[in-house]
Amino acid sequence: MAMVQPKSQKLRLFTTHLLLLIFIAAIMFPLLMVIAISLREGNFATGSLIPDTISWEHWRLALGFSVEHADGRVTPPPFPVLLWLWNSIKVAGITAIGIVALSTTCAYAFARMRFPGKATLLKGMLIFQMFPAVLSLVALYALFDRLGQYLPFVGLNTHGGVIFAYMGGIALHVWTIKGYFETIDGSLEEAAALDGATPWQAFRLVLVPLSVPILAVVFILSFIAAITEVPVASLLLRDVNSYTLAVGMQQYLNPQNYLWGDFAAAAVLSAIPITVVFLLAQRWLVNGLTAGGVKG
């Protein structure tokens, strides 16, 4: 005999689905609008969601090709968007790898070792991480200006300097990985030690392979944060050819000439690396997010 759902339950189900559809539409509308702007003729921010005439001129300029107009005019690419995109991927990738390496080793020390001041250090790291990076811009500029005199590859207007600055924000990741490490039974490392493994071997061959989900989460979050960051990169990078895409895209929004179409095409390009990284790591993402809670 078939089960008949009461009307109240059907109403709740309908309301839930309706709210979810509205939520998804609210998320998708800005993305679709940006794509629509990149496909319109001219550099206009307003217009219909579906362009009357699809034009690829903004995409051609973003990809480094010149555009020839009907009257014979040729518009060269105004900015090296693909170079900016490569700079973003390089900086974000190296930063994410470095943050994962530093955070993992620090978290292992806090989770497995005993030393004086451990609790104070943990709390201090978390407190300092709560202050926005904008408050430290003047100090960062002075620091990298002086540092560049001795180590030019990490000075001003270098990607090394930007990466070095980004890698300072590891406190939250250390807490997250530490919480994950504490969920792993220490007897596994003790068994490895009985078999003759050193602490480093137990960490590298036992703990790290079991922690891949949370490391994937930290990598993704670090990659996204680095590839979308603007204040620090715009402070340290001065040469147009060294810009990351997030910084370079601001060149399209000159007060005398807002190039909204070109800006939209570059914005869509900037989302491609994040999407690719997310898709490659999604198999570990859910497990890592649910298992990375910090224990009390």
Swiss-Prot record:
Protein name (database record): Maltose/maltodextrin transport system permease protein MalG
Keywords: Cell inner membrane, Cell membrane, Membrane, Sugar transport, Transmembrane, Transmembrane helix, Transport
Highest taxon above the source species: Bacteria
GO (cellular component) term, any one: plasma membrane
Chief localization: membrane
Oligomer and partners: The complex is composed of two ATP-binding proteins (MalK), two transmembrane proteins (MalG and MalF) and a solute-binding protein (MalE).
Domain ABC transmembrane type-1: 85-281
Sequence ranges on the Periplasmic membrane side: 36-88, 144-152, 228-257
InterPro entries the UniProt entry points to: BP-dep_ABC_trans_perm (IPR050901), MetI-like (IPR000515), MetI-like_sf (IPR035906)
Gene Ontology biological-process entries: maltodextrin transmembrane transport
Protein family: Belongs to the binding-protein-dependent transport system permease family. MalFG subfamily.
Cleaved signal peptide residues: none
Ranges per topology, Cytoplasmic: 1-12, 112-123, 176-204, 281-296
Protein localization: Cell inner membrane
Role, per record: Part of the ABC transporter complex MalEFGK involved in maltose/maltodextrin import. Probably responsible for the translocation of the substrate across the membrane.
GO terms, molecular function: ABC-type maltose transporter activity
SS bond list: none
Membrane topology classification: Multi-pass membrane protein
